[in-house]
């Protein structure tokens, strides 16, 4: 075939085709059918434009003899055959000069007479099938499509064939000749059968080098090459008897399909061990705020100024002492660090003008807490690759932890309403398209249900902390910058409020890669006595730093105020996602919206108003050992939001794995509930995949225990 291509096509076309294939990492010597197809396509594009000119009046002219009149300009701009960068440059300049909409994919030609891009297709299959594939791929009304086949058929958008009869006949004749030439050499059949559907970029993505070798090594038995295997998979129609299909795939496989009955599934095994501990980047239900209402001080909105103002609202400071040490840390350093923060804030107040930011002195306690000079020295790989026993040092398996009750309490708290509003109506973002009345109505109802929710407070707190930390990490790479943890809200009466939760001190932050870590020390106010659930606070050193007067039903009571201090770390990519936590609002809104849609399709009318305003109706919220929990529509909105927020706050590889694997078991159980008689093979393997994600993460363990409640009730 390669020899035929080189004989049959003009050398310039052959050279262009080779360049195109190399650009995609394909070899013309191996993928000879593709080589032939590219040459054919190039030739058709050139023939399409040959001899067609436009005169000064914009009229189309066909000139076949020698040198055309200098006043004529080519009717078609050829884009196909240029390298990608050049091709896009041409497309962009055409769009800029003519105002034509820019296409998503590179077209083949531009027609100056009709002012449109043209996509040329040459197919060995039915023209209409290929036409639909092309149209489906480019999804643009503006690009004109023209398909030719080797049998002389053609098809074009709106049956507008652009060229005169004779020019098209030339193209069809040439295609017919190519087909006959191939047939006479016994090449046509293989060429005809090798045509795949319209390829998207993903399908063009060729595997080369090491990956290619690995792919070839890991082929199932009985397959000689990756192409062979791909062709088999593409042609695999997944219907009919599964066992038969499996045995047809390989002699090695003998899967017995076991029926999945109510008695089949067992509960997930949760790990034993000490209770799991809190691992969020900031305190959740245990956080305490020092607040100012209607802030109007000088420098309002500058975090450091706001923080100092909030600190001044509290008068119960006392000499700090450690009430719950951190098992592994040097606890006096945490105490010294807090005293240093207080001292340096005092220094600032004595200055004439409060600065916008504060960099902490690099004391020994902060250097220790922030891991300064602790990173192992980096050595160039070149210098040590000759060391014979070079290996990565062993890391310990993570210690297994059992589910503790605090994480369910955290979740319940996140679903509750607070007495402040944390988002304005437009926080979810205006839709770009003109919103239909229904969509904005749904959004307003949803926002009303969640604006006062504690999970929404966590979103705004997370967005603020991550934004401030990422900014400081870039702006003050070498400094130990003091970053107040602040949030803003509105009271029931609509008054603005600024809250201070505590402080963060950031370590050195030369973050080159997304995953490079910046260390920080967090110091957060709380009224929670850590001695009640010491296992929850394993990673913290807790100080008692003051006494707070609280108004209660029986009058004022004094409660000790604690400071939860710990060393922590994050990375650019984690901060980027933290800054985007508002997406949780959108995700849960979409989930609620699909419930409204389901209700509306049953009633055959929009049920938005009834859905949100019928306070008597209850909806399933989740599973607990008691059974299916139900609640109002507001509770549903807040629970879905809290789940989304916790997925963000407690994001981890364990959660990724658990979500993906448990979903498979969930689908099987749902199929059983729908009487679809599901069958499974290697159910033990699926349980193994789920349970290897249950190690020590509190949120994953809680989800696993919910999953067990679901299994129990679903199979009753």
Curated annotation (Swiss-Prot):
Motif (Nuclear localization signal 1 (NLS1)): 124-139
Record carries keyword Manganese: yes
Family the entry assigns: Belongs to the influenza viruses PA family.
EC number: 3.1.-.-
Name this polypeptide is given: Polymerase acidic protein
Residue interval(s) of motif Nuclear localization signal 2 (NLS2): 184-247
Family annotation (HAMAP family): INFV_PA
Binding site for Mn(2+) 2: 80, 108
Disulfide bonds: none
Cofactor stoichiometry and binding remark: Binds 2 manganese ions per subunit.
InterPro entries xrefs: INFV_PA, PA/PA-X, PA/PA-X_sf
Gene3D superfamilies per record: Influenza RNA-dependent RNA polymerase subunit PA, endonuclease domain
BP GO annotations: cap snatching; DNA-templated transcription; symbiont-mediated suppression of host gene expression; symbiont-mediated suppression of host mRNA transcription via inhibition of RNA polymerase II activity; viral RNA genome replication; viral translational frameshifting
Subunit structure: Influenza RNA polymerase is composed of three subunits: PB1, PB2 and PA. Interacts (via C-terminus) with PB1 (via N-terminus).
The record's account of how the chain is modified after translation: Phosphorylated on serines and threonines by host kinases, including human casein kinase II.
Recorded GO MF terms: endonuclease activity; metal ion binding; RNA binding
One term under GO cellular component: host cell nucleus
Primary role: Plays an essential role in viral RNA transcription and replication by forming the heterotrimeric polymerase complex together with PB1 and PB2 subunits. The complex transcribes viral mRNAs by using a unique mechanism called cap-snatching. It consists in the hijacking and cleavage of host capped pre-mRNAs. These short capped RNAs are then used as primers for viral mRNAs. The PB2 subunit is responsible for the binding of the 5' cap of cellular pre-mRNAs which are subsequently cleaved after 10-13 nucleotides by the PA subunit that carries the endonuclease activity.
Chief place of localization: host cell
Keywords linked to the UniProt accession: Cap snatching, Endonuclease, Eukaryotic host gene expression shutoff by virus, Eukaryotic host transcription shutoff by virus, Host cytoplasm, Host gene expression shutoff by virus, Host nucleus, Host-virus interaction, Hydrolase, Inhibition of host RNA polymerase II by virus, Manganese, Metal-binding, Nuclease, Phosphoprotein
Binding site for Mn(2+) 1: 41, 108, 119-120
Cofactor: Mn(2+)
